[in-house]
């Protein structure tokens, strides 16, 4: 599970 990758995806979706 890529937590940092998921976080970046969420941030870029804002």
From Swiss-Prot:
What GO cellular-component annotations does this UniProt entry give? extracellular region; membrane; other organism cell membrane
Where in the cell?
Answer: Secreted; Target cell membrane
Positions carrying Leucine amide: 14
Expression tissues = Expressed by the venom gland.
Query: Any idea which UniProt keywords this protein has?
Result: Amidation, Membrane, Secreted, Target cell membrane, Target membrane
Q: Does the keyword Membrane apply?
A: yes
Please give the superkingdom of this protein's source. Answer: Eukaryota
Mainly localized where? secreted
Q: What does this protein do?
A: Antimicrobial peptide with activity against Gram-negative and Gram-positive bacteria, as well as against fungi. Has potent hemolytic activity against erythrocytes.
Record-stated family: Belongs to the MCD family. Mastoparan subfamily.
- Protein's recorded name: Eumenine mastoparan-EM3
Species this protein is from: Eumenes micado (Potter wasp)
Taxonomic lineage is: Eukaryota, Metazoa, Ecdysozoa, Arthropoda, Hexapoda
């Amino acid at each position: 599970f890529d937590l940092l990758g998921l976080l970046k995806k969420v941030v870029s979706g804002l």
